């Protein structure tokens, strides 16, 4: 049995919703979007925010003095009623002659400021609808304005600078997380990972499990007969699939692991003590399960920070996932 849940609002969705509601109410609004980032820039490619004429803001382009400067600039342009489509380069180095951001972190980023008008309402509405329905598409920003295309691009990001510049981004959820087991640690991990724009699915076989009922952070709850069913529910995904096995015991962990071991994931973690994980891996080796499969498993899952509570365990696993995601 599968249920979709949407009580928890995602950061990007909230930002686009502010853009849409501003236009629907006739409130002037500006979109700030990071088209390109280099080096140690705090605002990475794809970061964005919306500022409207009533003082509302959602999203971020990296924070700090640079973001403050741009939000103040946006408010001034809104007060003046400017129709703006302006690309600005920001260099985070006080030694450069121009385009200084006021920061000293040595990176740089390129930001577009775009006034949102009636012409953009349909486009933004489509973006909101696609995120709400968990579909992907292509956001295109260019010297001609903004549009949304239903075709999903091959690349997550693309930017062509110049006078007739073009920026394209795959919208929707790029990263998917599969949590196997729905206990206290899974609840804490779901809460944390939902803030990081992962599409989260959780699997358990225990009907009426209190921690599953309280878990309003996942997008999808899947009740299964037993963990042998996972083979038809979770597929390989070496680029964007992140899996953590954290069931209620050794037997159910083993059942899930046997189904998932042949698959490739960007991250594959197994929660448990060192002794339990070692015993499980030794057993698989004795059975002749390929060492290549076993090397892909991170067990015990999470960075070694002597975590004890579900919340601390969730932090350790989330940190390891972020580490893997960014290739550290």
Predicted regions and their residues:
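Segments forming oxygen-rich coordination pockets for charged ligands
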Residues: 2-205, 209-220, 238-241, 255, ...
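Residue-level detector of alpha-helix initiation sites
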Residues: 183-184, 250-251, 275
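Short hydrophobic/aromatic-enriched beta-strand-loop microsegments
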Residues: 202, 221-222, 264-271, 290-297
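ADP-ribose/adenylate-binding Rossmann-like module
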Residues: 203, 242, 247-248, 258-283
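Short acidic loop-to-helix transition motifs that present clustered carboxylates
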Residues: 207-208, 228-229, 252
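Short amphipathic alpha-helix with an adjacent loop that forms part of the alpha/beta core around
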Residues: 227-238
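Adenosine-phosphate binding glycine-rich loop
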Residues: 271-328
